[in-house]
Curated annotation (Swiss-Prot):
Keywords: Cell membrane, Membrane, Transmembrane, Transmembrane helix
Extent of Basic and acidic residues compositional bias: 857-869
Region annotated Disordered, chain positions: 857-876
Location of this chain's protein in the cell: Cell membrane
InterPro entries, alphabetized: UPF0182 (IPR005372)
Membrane-spanning ranges: 8-28, 46-66, 91-111, 151-171, 200-220, 243-263, 271-291
GO CC terms: extracellular region; plasma membrane
Record-stated family: Belongs to the UPF0182 family.
Main location: membrane
Entry protein name: UPF0182 protein CPF_0011
Keyword Mitochondrion on entry: no
Disulfide bonds: none
Length: 918
């Protein structure tokens, strides 16, 4: 008795341990979703699956049970009365297993489609063939097709059950003797027809009926056809294929009746004829369609396909939100006058003279402070700095976890990044280096931007958990040879109770969490610190932009991310990057200190986000609840902009004839991305791979020019604003034909503006401008001289901005010594308008040389504090400059950057020589 009790206790404990191990992930998910405030979102899926599982299980179980019940007489005849009761138990158990597996598979794969179906929101647009609202294709048709597939699968399962039972019972008992009143299963008088003839007749009839209905549903898929010259149903699809599908559907209905009757009457000829007829129709359809396409449509393709091309143009433009672009014609004037520059001096003041790649390289050399920090990315944003609207580069200083070798350092000690580097986009120092407004540790802030808490616990590179509030504290930031510590006082993380210590030791497969004496009951474990993974865990049904950016808000740091709703089910819209409908419907804000995540709806007209609002109650907030100062940092997402640009290369036209003849196809402008070494000029570094950013280099080291965030002013506007610009060429040519701009300031957010240039004129595109630079004898001579001295020449971003009815071209040149720790510095500015091109040390000199223009304000764009070479204005200024150069040389020496050290010493020598001559 005692042994039985002991065994029972041991088995119970063992079961509890197994259940605990199996449910570890579930328990942690429940705690984590509760911490972030979205527990209802987590349970939405589970509740939906459970709600679906029960009725689907009952349906499966009842259908199979009823079917088996119809076989009871045949089974009893095979096994006899004595064995029938035991056989019934096996059938019941098998039915349970099959029903559980079938219901589980259906519920776990179809729950989302069912929620979309029941919460569908109309688009208010119908397709031109079936006149169905777009919501039918996006929310309803996928579920209906899946359910039909499930029904067909169930019929096949029932057929297999019949065959398995028939064979299993036959092999089990082999040959039964007539004296036992059991029929011989192998006798000619008792085959499978007599065993389950009526049942199979019903199944065959239902299967034929389902196949017929599936062809009717298949007709709706013609709106995604790729047969014709445009995406979506074409002439052949509508006039031939659709008719065949209807005929096949009718034939299947007739066949279902014929099959049912024929099986019952043992007449197989009608079955063969009906099935053969359907097979002939199925084979004949593509043959007739190909014949029609080749011999009817092709000779008259323009006339026959014209309406369907129009459908594709309209649908694609609406689906990618490019149907309301403000298009303007521009005839560029090749001469920019000084008066025109003075009228647009705010554009000149904000010309972008820094490029992301070289700037990030400089940040990594100068602003890391210690090797356990890293800068993953440098993003463009704008702030009101000391009362002036200013565009800046911002890069957060995160912890480099790859440099951590011990568990304590990686998870307990180095828990967070610290601060950021911020520099002006439109200016550099006298040495061509970034003009910082925030830098160093602790943060040196020369702006009126309030940053009280610069700590970053959640970021782009934080892929591991950390445990905070431990004995000994966390490393905060270095000051000389000492280290400052910090104890986390935020709201993020889960309390490390004894239960959780055991739980996370199992989950992370690391006993140190349980055994470490540094962890107390007040400690917290912070999970999902990578901001992309964090938001994906909460809302995996959204697509996220590859470039989150950090914002200073209310004295702390927050991340802003763009999220998209998308589908590939929009009728007649040609897919790009796997989607054929997309909206930037959500802005996500993640607190870098606490990890709080807020989802704000920015497009209330998007049916997909409105469907999600009905499904996930409490997940999304209205935009009106977002703090106003955060709205000032909205950016038009670059991934979406580049996707729209790709679509526009073909779908910028409204005339179906032009699309058919391909006489007006565009390409996004190319740019040389490598010259004399590593490319550092293109785009934001550290961008995540995304379905929306897949530009690739060609064999000539050319890639599509990435859209650039610039501060500029449209010809018809009064105020400067941040915009995203992209450039287009005629297909196969390099002359620029259009400029696309996305607006993002204030009420203009989301507006797209396009300037079209006359195609008969040669308008320099980015790559033509780059070629012109390299072919100019004065510029190429200077560049060759630098390259000959062992320096690496790096081109910055090519900027093309409209100034009223003219175009101004800008490119910067960086020099970088060929040494491991050297830093790129901006040394020359190339400026061009019309046929004139100049190269100078800074914007001011380039403007003076090109236009004889000197702004009334001093040194706005670059080299703000520069004293021109050979013009030392006073002894004090010369001494100050010499002292500054000496300090920079010493700093370069400490960093082991001997190339930069030598450069500073040479400059110092020049100044001292000039001073001695005076």
């Amino acid at each position: 008795m005692k042994n039985k009790i002991l065994n029972t206790v041991l088995i119970s404990i063992l079961l509890l341990v197994v259940v605990f191990f199996v449910s570890t992930n579930f328990i942690i998910n429940v705690q984590w979703f509760k911490e972030v405030g979205y527990l209802n979102v987590f349970f939405t899926k589970l509740i939906a699956i459970c709600k679906l599982f029960v009725p689907i299980f009952i349906l499966y179980f009842c259908v199979i049970a009823i079917y088996l019940f119809t076989l009871r007489k045949s089974i009893r005849s095979l096994v006899g009365d004595t064995k029938f009761k035991s056989v019934k138990k096996y059938f019941l158990l098998s039915n349970l297993v099959i029903s559980i597996l079938g219901a589980g598979a259906t519920a776990t794969t179809q729950w989302y489609k069912i929620l979309q179906f029941t919460n569908a929101v109309p688009f208010g647009e119908v397709d031109p063939i079936f006149n169905k609202d777009i919501s039918f294709y996006v929310f309803k048709l996928p579920l209906v097709q899946s359910l039909f597939s499930t029904a067909i699968s169930l019929i096949i399962i029932l057929v297999l059950i019949t065959v398995i039972i028939y064979l299993a019972l036959g092999f089990k008992d082999k040959i039964y003797q007539n004296k036992d009143n059991v029929i011989n299963i192998n006798s000619k008088t008792y085959g499978i027809r007599k065993f389950a003839g009526k049942q199979l007749a019903v199944l065959a009839s239902v299967l034929s009926l389902l196949i017929g209905c599936s062809y009717l549903l298949k007709s709706y898929n013609l709106v995604y056809s790729t047969r014709g010259v445009s995406y979506g149903a074409g002439y052949t699809d509508v006039k031939i294929t659709m008719i065949f599908y209807k005929v096949i559907a009718v034939a299947c209905v007739i066949s279902s009746i014929v099959v049912f009757i024929s099986i019952l009457k043992l007449k197989f000829r009608p079955i063969i004829i009906s099935i053969a007829s359907i097979a002939v129709l199925i084979v004949l359809e593509p043959v007739v369609a190909i014949f029609t396409q080749q011999f009817v449509v092709k000779p008259n393709e323009m006339e026959l396909e014209k309406p369907y091309i129009s459908y594709s143009i309209d649908a694609t433009k609406k689906a990618f939100n490019i149907d309301e672009i403000e298009v303007k014609e521009m005839e560029p004037n090749e001469n920019i006058t000084s008066e025109k520059l003075e009228d647009n001096k705010d554009i000149i003041e904000n010309l972008k003279v820094n490029s992301t790649g070289p700037l990030l390289s400089f940040y990594q050399q100068v602003q890391l402070i210690k090797n356990y920090y890293e800068f993953n990315d440098a993003d463009t944003d704008r702030y009101n700095i000391n009362g002036k609207y200013t565009q800046v580069f911002v890069s957060p200083r995160e912890i480099n976890r790859d440099s951590m070798t011990t568990w304590q350092n990686k998870h307990l000690r180095y828990t967070h990044g610290y601060g950021l580097a911020m520099s002006r986009v439109n200016s550099v120092t006298e040495f061509g280096q970034p003009d910082f407004v925030m830098k160093d540790i602790p943060t040196v802030n020369t702006t009126d931007i309030n940053l009280e808490n610069p700590r970053i616990y959640f970021g782009e590179s934080d892929n591991d958990y950390v445990i905070v509030n431990t004995e000994g504290g966390e490393f905060d930031y270095p000051t000389g040879d000492t280290e400052n510590t910090f104890n986390y006082n935020g709201t993020g993380g889960l309390k490390m109770t004894p239960f959780n210590r055991v739980l996370f030791s199992i989950y992370e497969r690391n006993p140190k969490i349980l055994m470490s004496s540094s962890i107390t009951s007040e400690s917290r474990i912070i999970l999902n610190r990578n901001i992309v993974k964090r938001v994906q865990e909460i809302a995996p049904f959204l697509t996220y932009d590859s470039d989150p950016y950090i914002v200073v808000h209310d004295g702390r740091l927050v991340w802003m991310m763009d999220a998209y709703t998308s589908t590939d089910k929009y009728p007649f819209s040609e897919p790009h990057e796997g989607v054929n409908y997309i909206r930037n419907s959500v802005k996500v804000v993640v607190d870098a200190f606490n990890g709080n995540v807020d989802f704000y709806v920015t497009d209330e007209n998007d049916p997909i986000i409105n469907c999600y609002l009905k499904i996930y109650k409490g997940l999304f907030k209205p935009l009106s609840e977002m703090p106003e100062d955060l709205k000032e940092h909205f950016r038009y997402p670059q991934d979406l902009f580049e996707l729209q640009s790709k679509v526009l290369t073909k779908y910028h036209v409204d005339d179906p004839i032009k699309l058919f003849t391909e006489e007006d196809l565009w390409d996004r402008s190319l740019e040389v991305v490598k010259h004399g070494g590593e490319n550092l000029s293109q785009g934001d570094e550290g961008k995540e791979e995304s379905i929306l950013n897949k530009a690739k280099e060609n064999k000539n080291n050319e890639a599509e020019n990435e859209g650039l965030y610039l501060m500029t002013k449209l010809p018809d506007e009064e105020n400067v604003e941040m915009m995203l610009l992209d450039y287009f060429n005629m297909r196969g040519k390099q002359s620029m034909v259009a400029l696309l701009g996305a607006r993002m300031d204030g009420d203009n957010y989301g507006e797209l503006v396009m300037y079209k240039f006359p195609p008969q004129r040669t308008i320099y595109s980015p790559i033509l401008f780059k070629n012109r630079i390299q072919q100019d004898p004065n510029i190429s001579k200077e560049i060759s001289l630098w390259a000959g001295k062992g320096s690496e020449v790096i081109y910055g971003d090519i900027i093309i901005v409209p100034i009223e009815d003219s175009l101004l071209y800008l490119n910067t040149i960086y020099l970088k010594a060929n040494s491991e720790n050297s830093m790129p510095e901006m040394k020359r500015v190339i400026l061009s308008n019309g046929d004139k091109i100049v190269i100078e040390e800074n914007i001011e000199k380039a403007l003076l040389k090109l236009f004889n223009y000197s702004s009334s304000e001093e040194n706005k764009n670059s080299n703000k504090d520069e004293t021109p070479k050979n013009e030392i204005t006073s002894d004090n200024s010369g001494i100050k400059e010499a002292a500054d150069l000496f300090n920079k040389a010493i700093e370069a020496q400490k960093n082991g950057d001997w190339a930069t050290y030598g450069e500073f010493i040479n400059k110092l020598g020049d100044i001292l020589n000039k001073m001695s001559q005076e």
